[in-house]
Amino acid sequence: MAKFVVTLRLPDTIDEDFISRIPRHRAFINRLIEENIIEAYAISADRTRGWVTMNGATAASVQAVVEQFPLYQFLSEVQIDELFVFDSAASRFPRISLN
């Protein structure tokens, strides 16, 4: 299975409809993390952009999942890039502690 990074562009103004969908969106994201479909999820401090590292067979299959995000209709831009290398501390064995 390939890894993809999805770059999201959030709306310039956030209205009540957007805010009301956040709990459902977070629950959906958490479920995808538990199912190992999403590996990492981040939103910029200024809340204008987001990055999601996802596992999927193809960019089209990743796009299909992103389109299910409860906040999808508010995204002004979605870019999907397949990764050649993805390395992180979370994907390594834990360090051994000699107590």
Features from the language model and the residues they span:
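Conserved, structured core segments of small domains
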Residues: 1-99
